Amino acid sequence: MEVLQLWSDRVVLEITERSEVGANFSWEGALERVKAMGFQIAVDDLGSGYAALNMLAELQPHFMKVDMSIVRNVDKDEHKRRLVDLLCSFAEATDSEVVAEGVETDEEAAALADAGVDLMQGYLYGEPSLTLTA
């Protein structure tokens, strides 16, 4: 870490909900080591796979990144809105933060903010870039 001039408390390791690991893999041991080094954990693409609740229980992430399939039209879809409300309540109860991915409209952003989403990313805020900025 020192050679790369990285501060572990500024690095978030994203584990996608769709990640496949071997049957003998233990998240617990690996995550204890990663967290002990000061890294933070995020579950990415939450809502796009099949084991979301199991992953949340095992990983105890610092961040929950809601997949854009749930974010899209959240301002017009009451079921999606209720799901985001529940995720925000769960995140608050577990000291996690909710990140909404793929936010494209002001209306989506407003609905997500009203639900309690902590952070948002998407084309509404800027296009993806290969350039690193601090």
Task: Describe the predicted segments one by one.
Residues E14-A23, F39-A134:
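EAL-family c-di-GMP phosphodiesterase catalytic domain
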Residues S26-G29:
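Signal-transducing alpha-helical linker
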Residues V3-Q5, V34, T131-A134:
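Alpha-helix C-terminal capping segments
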Residues M1-V12, M37, E92-T94:
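Helix C-cap/alpha-to-beta connector motif
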